């Protein structure tokens, strides 16, 4: 309650300050006094925010036994707007409980909701790296270059999605996995790399066949009624080549990480573990598989003339290249269509914009569920997904040894 009361006071305080600026200009107040006034207001604001903010990073404090097999993994969380150290601790504790791994929270300190939103606009529209971005960059880069870890999992929420789109280093990315919730960013990149990273004498044909994305896996989770996601990820995934990664859109409202996202997508049971079944993960979807990708015509086996929002999802990065076909995280052409008529307008959407496939032709369908496409779901309760990227590197090394 104290934290909430401070935030409410800051909203009123900051709005009053912003409203006073045009009044001061109209009254032609002395410039020196105006600067002193602004400095005083911002100084008081920082003192108040000091009650909310804490150290640069926090570690989860859940008292559970972690399997030794997870010692080579590093989980990092970057919070969104208006999150002080208390709420950050609650977020990383919930994540640690969900995935049974220690989680480090890199604190994106709050300056109050109004000023935080202004910072979001600065970071997103001008790609400006604030001090928060630089601190987070150092934490992630240190983890990537640390030989003690062979997998780095980055979880981003809200404004953390903006900062994550700015801080991802351009080297050592094969160890990195990124999962976002309510992403407020306007872009998310994932450049290509090929086996020449590991093999010096690979020929051009083999290289083309093994071109993959630099970051092993990117997934974005969003609520259709989350206003932050609406002017962030749900808006900019419509633009080709701007947002890479698989998108999971759940019908629903709310933006808070624990209360709205994790409780809906990774609900806990009475024993403190993630339930094996929940409404969102059990949503039935249809994966369209390619039969002939060289034809100019496209045909859907689902009902024609589906309305907007019915569940038809497209690959959106607009590249048409057979060398990349069927390589995007197990989705043959990354076009998924909702199959449960009883759900209606509340259908869950899954979109894989990692896929470079432009044309979808003569498909045959197979029914799967949301959980079958969610890699993050495979981490629940301390489990792990198959190490696909590591297997690829090992196979590449074996091929090099045989040449």
Listing of model-derived features with the role each one plays in the protein:
Residues 212-403:
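C-terminal catalytic-base region of ester-bond hydrolases, centering on the histidine
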Residues 93-94, 169-170, 238-240:
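Amphipathic alpha-helical scaffolding segments
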